[in-house]
A protein has these predicted regions:
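Membrane-helix interface linkers and caps
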Residues: 2, 27, 31, 35-76, ...
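Membrane-helix interface segments
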Residues: 4-9, 32-34, 58, 68-71, ...
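Alpha-helical transmembrane segments
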Residues: 7-21, 43-45, 74-83, 161
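Membrane-interface helix/loop boundary segments of multi-pass membrane proteins
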Residues: 17, 132-159, 204-208
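Juxtamembrane/transmembrane-helix boundary motifs at the membrane-water interface
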Residues: 20-39, 94-101, 172-181, 225-239
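Short aromatic-rich membrane-water interface segments that cap or initiate transmembrane helices
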Residues: 104-123, 180-190
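Central hydrophobic cores of alpha-helical transmembrane segments
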Residues: 154-161, 211-221
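C-terminal membrane module of polytopic membrane proteins
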Residues: 205, 215-276
Length: 276
């Protein structure tokens, strides 16, 4: 096993173990706040920063420029369309329903100005949290996994690690009330395996960490508010609709990343000799 593979193993184990140990203390300390769980988004980036420091590796390859404006636009349009399509389909099929207008969440549907204000507030709060994850997942792990295992296997591995990193958080915080085991241990990893491709595409094409950070925060806010305003009446069916939408988008973007033209643009997609 070469050094880069060892570092990836240290990263994965460190992220999973640290997160699990912290979350395991929540019931003992009577912590039920979602903000405490959200703070764990800094764990992947912190572990990555520690490994980079120990190896004395440069931060420059992560990409700190702003990149072309078109990828910022994609970062807005793509999650908006995906969630919009999924919500509309779920509403039509009866898998979700609008929250009553008399409730705080339902009132946002008929008060768009209030909705935008709340979304902007939470978006600003979410940006540093999203950076904590993206620095670790995209900035550190993704290019190394692709070099060592190739594009498809590397992204699959990243999606699995990313998904199971969420598992203890979602399990302890009871975020899948109807399916407390299936949700965290099966549905969440599948969700992250599918969403890892659009995030990888944005990072590779934009060549900077800010576009996936922005998209991560923006998508989290859209997903969160859509779930509050249009709660699921059938949790699994509603989830399946979103996964089908994500699978279609991921297939298209993965084919683009696998194309010869894209590999000529992004040489990092080619497997490194060090992976042998």
């Amino acid at each position: 096993m070469n050094q880069e593979k060892k570092d990836l193993l240290y990263f994965a184990l460190g992220v999973l173990l640290v997160t699990t140990l912290i979350v395991a203390s929540f019931p003992l300390l009577h912590i039920t706040s979602n903000w405490a769980a959200n703070a764990l988004m800094f764990v992947p980036g912190s572990i990555a920063a520690l490994l980079l420091l120990l190896r004395r590796e440069s931060l420059r390859p992560i990409g700190w420029g702003l990149g072309p404006a078109r990828y910022w636009l994609v970062g807005i349009v793509l999650p908006t369309l995906m969630i919009l399509v999924a919500v509309v389909i779920s509403l039509r099929l009866g898998y979700a329903a609008p929250a009553p207008a008399s409730t705080p969440h339902g009132s946002l549907i008929v008060h768009p100005a209030k909705l935008v204000k709340n979304m902007l507030l939470y978006f600003v709060i979410s940006l540093p949290l999203a950076f904590g994850e993206e620095f670790g997942w995209r900035g550190y792990a993704q290019p190394r996994l692709i070099r060592q295992f190739g594009l498809v296997s590397g992204l699959l591995a990243l999606g699995i690690i990313w998904g199971f990193w969420h598992t203890p958080i979602y399990y302890v915080m009871h975020w899948y009330s109807e399916h407390p085991l299936l949700g965290p241990f099966v549905m969440t990893p599948i969700d992250n395996i599918l969403v890892v491709v659009p995030m990888a595409w944005l990072y590779i094409r934009s060549k900077n960490i800010w576009v996936p950070t922005f998209t991560h925060a923006f998508a989290d806010i859209l997903w969160g508010f859509s779930g509050l305003m249009f709660p699921a009446t059938h949790e699994i069916q509603n989830w399946v609709v979103l996964q089908v939408v994500q699978a279609i988008v991921s297939a298209v973007l993965l084919m683009d990343l696998l194309s010869k033209r894209q590999q000529s643009i992004a040489p990092e997609l080619r497997e490194s000799p060090a992976s042998a």
